[in-house]
Amino acid sequence: MRAKSLIITLFGDVISQHGGEIWLGSIAKSVDALGINDRLVRTSVFRLAKEGWLEVEREGRKSFYGFTRSGGKEYQRAAQRIYSAGGDSWRGGWQLLMPTNLPEHLRDDFRRSLTWLGFRPISNGTFARPGGDEESIRDLLDEFDLSSGVVVMEAKTTALTTSKEWRAIVSEHWQLSHLEEDYRQLIGLFRPLKKALDKGQLAAPVEAFQARLLLIHEYRRILLRDTPLPNDLLPNRWQGTVARQLAQALYRDLAAPSTNYIQTELVNRQGRLPESEHYFYERFGGIAKAP
């Protein structure tokens, strides 16, 4: 497990919902039981700060970390997919995006951001996604100051191409077979926990926190390589749908006990972390507040 990636998940899933800042010692405490030692934590947050993901504030000998503005925006794009309830309809439309003047130093970050928006390369220099909205593209172009360096077009499928042919094209270019195997592994890893909770077994706050962090980390890792495709373009019994339903249900089960751990064991400059932001309860279509 990559320490840097896990720490990004910690900030995106947890810290962003509880004040946006955390003490370095609490970061180490959060991931210690998951095999990330203190030395690796310090090295990882230093590198994440250097790469522009995190910013640091120091008070005496203590360091407190939070997302940078750009780091927070990047994760927010991911969050729109991670915590989606699914079920979006599709009317056969496609968005095509062709960078015409992309500076070399922006290339990797821009393409990663395109991936989170659901775009994939379909030919040299052309990216496509089914459906989608213009606002997310406009925000991305504004962020990278590329409004004059990118061509955006819309296309539509017709009856000249059958759904079977479209599914074959998507399966090949989106590499669905590899993704489906990853989703199966995710389901195999977390379904036993869901079954145990359904039978009335209670998760201790620290265990719920660790399970929640691992769930979102593994789910995010797969989504980074997946594109949110409509059901019309997916294979029958697509395991990505099963994985999303499992993640949604399990996250709801773990929300209350994991939040208990977060607010009693982790600290920032003001002391214990504050209550969850209101939009935390909108994740996965709605999470019930603890009584």
Q: How would you label these PLM feature ranges?
A:
Residues 80-122:
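Amphipathic alpha-helical dimerization/coiled-coil segments
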Residues 104-200:
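Mid-protein regulatory/catalytic core that forms ligand/cofactor-binding pockets
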Residues 52:
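Glycine-centered, phosphate/nucleic-acid-interacting loop/turn motifs that mediate DNA/RNA or nucleotide
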Residues 58-64:
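Short, Lys/Arg-rich nucleic-acid/phosphate-binding segment
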Residues 1-13, 73:
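Short alpha-helical segments that sit at the start of domains
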Residues 18-31:
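Short acidic, hydrophobic short linear motifs in intrinsically disordered regions
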